[in-house]
Amino acid sequence: MEKKLTIIIPNYNGLKFMEPCFAALEKQSYKNYDLLVVDNGSTDGSVEWLKEHGISSIFLAENTGFTGAVNVGIKAAHTPYVILLNNDTEPEKDYVKEMVRMMETSPKIFSVSCKIIQMYQKELMDDAGDMYTVLGWAFQRGVGQ
């Protein structure tokens, strides 16, 4: 049985990205997920669009940035796994399935990330995941490759 998870999407004035992102999520081969958008005080019609489409959302009064929004979403999630997904992404159909599969390979795994392809230069990577030093400094792998 598939474990349930929550996909958390932070949004700030990202109305133009909503339809492609949600269309890609509808095509996912892994279906056992909740979707939660945390809106950072958008003024571009995002709030109205989310309400019109009945998408589970939390509406913040001001822009708290990516970290603030996803932390609100994580606190609201009640599933064993969460996926943090930018609103300007169009994940491939097995994205969620593969993320869960990797998490399930070992109880020692705390988090997984995926290879992100640039939106406008699809032959280049935007990022192949973040790595952290023992001091907590983060750095990205694969940028521009």
Model-derived regions: residue spans:
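Active-site beta-to-alpha loop of glycosyltransferases that engages the nucleotide-sugar donor
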Residues: 9-20, 41
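Short, acidic, metal-binding catalytic loop of nucleotide-sugar glycosyltransferases
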Residues: 23-32
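A conserved acidic beta->alpha catalytic loop
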Residues: 24, 39-47, 62
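Glycine-rich, basic loop-to-helix element that forms the pyrophosphate-binding segment
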Residues: 59-77, 87, 98
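Short aromatic/hydrophobic "clamp" motif used to bind/position activated sugar donors
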Residues: 82
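Conserved donor NDP-sugar-binding/catalytic core segment of glycosyltransferases
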Residues: 90-132
